[in-house]
Amino acid sequence: MACPSLACCLLGLLALTSACYIQNCPLGGKRAVLDLDMRKCLPCGPGGKGRCFGPSICCADELGCFVGTAEALRCQEENYLPSPCQSGQKPCGSGGRCAATGICCSPDGCRTDPACDPESAFSER
């Protein structure tokens, strides 16, 4: 009598676990879900040509960066969205990303950075 009840308990526990069974495994295994690409940050600025880089920073290649202006107001909406986002092409500075030609932005602010200037990469030294 103890053996069937033990088997039922084990089957019940097995059903309640969040194991990755053959029929419901994500591609790449259980940990692959953590490696999903981040979404792009909200568009902002004139004509929606820019992307948010922080709660009050909007940057676009053609327009430069707007910090704390009306063009960057939409970026405050990012604080209320559940998933993280990422703007810019390549990393730069201390935790920032290239926002416009020669400008590196992080959520804290923007600064000039030669790593974000495509022409400085080809200039002679």
Swiss-Prot record:
UniProt-listed GO biological process terms: drinking behavior; eating behavior; female pregnancy; grooming behavior; heart development; male mating behavior; maternal aggressive behavior; maternal behavior
Residues modified to Glycine amide: G28
Signal peptide positions on this chain: 1-19
Disulfide feature: C20-C25, C41-C85, C44-C58, C52-C75, C59-C65, C92-C104, C98-C116, C105-C110
Job description of the protein: Neurophysin 1 specifically binds oxytocin. Oxytocin causes contraction of the smooth muscle of the uterus and of the mammary gland. Acts by binding to oxytocin receptor (OXTR).
Subunit structure: Interacts with oxytocin receptor (Ki=1.5 nM). Interacts with vasopressin V1aR/AVPR1A (Ki=37 nM), V1bR/AVPR1B (Ki=222 nM), and V2R/AVPR2 receptors (Ki=823 nM).
Protein name from the UniProt record: Oxytocin-neurophysin 1
Native organism taxonomy: Eukaryota, Metazoa, Chordata, Craniata, Vertebrata
Gene: Oxt
